[in-house]
Amino acid sequence: MGKKYTVTYKVAPQGSQYVYQADKNEHKAGDVHSSFGGHMWYVLNDGDGNKESFGFESKHDQMLGEGQITPFDDVAYQQTSYETTVELTEFQYNRLKAFSEDPSLVGFDETRYNVAKNSCVDFVFASLKAIG
């Protein structure tokens, strides 16, 4: 029997508590704030129990500006309103892993954040395109 690769998509509702895992702008690791608009991200499982979280955020906590991939969402967000796990083939897992490391593979611009058209929601949607 082969490995069971999975991806779990997660949604944190507006107002969810977020605990900073590293210093970011004026926030220090351990600071807590409420999510202004909610958030989406996903967690990859390699079939051996190793999990990696991938999300997309504003680098400077602004609605427009620089963007960045973040590995902290799964531990930083203290509640979710929705989660769904999808089993992946090895090919799909490898495609999603490659996308997670280089989102431009499917045309996603990780350098620019725009809450209206290049946000965490768009990042998650692009991840779905990556796995077909």
Residue ranges and their predicted role:
Residues 2-85:
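Glycine-rich catalytic cores of cysteine/serine-nucleophile enzymes that process amide/ester linkages
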Residues 72-132:
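Active-site nucleophile-His-acid catalytic modules used for acyl/amide transfer and hydrolysis
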